[in-house]
UniProtKB/Swiss-Prot annotation:
Gene3D superfamilies: 3.30.300.20. The lineage of its organism: Bacteria, Pseudomonadati, Pseudomonadota, Gammaproteobacteria, Pasteurellales. InterPro entries: KH_dom-like_a/b (IPR015946), RbfA (IPR000238), RbfA_dom_sf (IPR023799). It comes from the Bacteria. It holds the Pfam family RBFA. This is Ribosome-binding factor A. It comes from Haemophilus ducreyi (strain 35000HP / ATCC 700724). PANTHER family: RIBOSOME-BINDING FACTOR A, CHLOROPLASTIC-RELATED. One of several proteins that assist in the late maturation steps of the functional core of the 30S ribosomal subunit. Associates with free 30S ribosomal subunits (but not with 30S subunits that are part of 70S ribosomes or polysomes). Required for efficient processing of 16S rRNA. May interact with the 5'-terminal helix region of 16S rRNA. GO terms for biological process: maturation of SSU-rRNA. It is found in: Cytoplasm. Monomer. Binds 30S ribosomal subunits, but not 50S ribosomal subunits or 70S ribosomes. Belongs to the RbfA family. One of its GO terms (cellular component) is cytosol.
Length: 126
């Protein structure tokens, strides 16, 4: 009988929780601002972790770029705090990636809504 979750999935879930708390409470860099950890993917050997993040004002590319620079600069500090919070033999190297899926999802939703509205307007004319 196989396990429901792989160890890397469980570690990724715990990393997501811990990184979110660390970003909220410990990291004081003003460039980062309001950041949300949307997902974490961990390699099978737990050596690398991709941390997908979104920012509150994600329509401004300058804010996103500054926030990503701040996260990269704070990466070693975050990793140190993770080492204190989690009991792992190997603590993954952190790579922060801006998650555009939320923005793209909203854009697609708006496109679908516009198509539905234009289709309804056409049917009212007929």
């Amino acid at each position: 009988m196989s396990r429901e979750f792989k160890r890397s999935d469980r570690v990724a879930q715990e990393l997501q929780k811990e990184i979110a708390v660390i970003l909220q409470r410990e990291v004081k860099d003003p460039r980062i601002g309001m950041v949300t950890v949307s997902d974490v993917e961990v390699s099978r050997d737990l050596a690398y972790a991709k941390i997908f993040v979104t920012f509150l004002f994600d329509n401004d590319q300058d804010i996103i770029a500054q926030g990503m620079k701040g996260l990269e600069k704070a990466g070693p500090y975050i990793r140190t705090l993770l080492g204190k919070a989690m009991r792992l033999r190997i603590l993954p190297e952190l790579r922060f990636i801006y998650d555009q899926s939320l923005v793209e999802g909203m854009r697609m939703s708006n496109l679908v809504s516009n198509v539905i509205k234009s289709d309804q307007a056409k049917h009212k004319e007929d």
